[in-house]
Amino acid sequence: MTVTVPVITPTELKARLDAGNVPTLVDVRELYEADIADLPEHGQARIPTAEFADRFEELDRGQELVLYCRSGRRSEWAARILLENGYERVFNLKGGVLGWRNEVDPDLPAY
């Protein structure tokens, strides 16, 4: 059975951050990618995709988690792992960093 991963749009996430409703943002990109472009730091965790299957249990099951990568594909995969392992409050950032750039912050570098 395939698990459906809930999504949150960049605009929705920005509104929540601005309102003080801050989920844990989980960056699953490679470390060098964060040096190129990054989202505002609000309780971020960084677990690169290559390490995710071994390290996901570092994430607090009680927290709301929003996963992101460059375009949303790797973070969708990672979010699915969490959901399949009993995490409940998990969302994938639609479009990833590129979606954030398109909807929220056009000054963020594209890569």
Mark where each language-model region is.
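Rhodanese-like catalytic fold shared by cysteine-dependent sulfurtransferases
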Residues: M1-T24, E30-E64, R73-Y111
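Short, surface-exposed ligand- or partner-binding patches at beta-edge/loop junctions that are enriched
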Residues: L67-C69
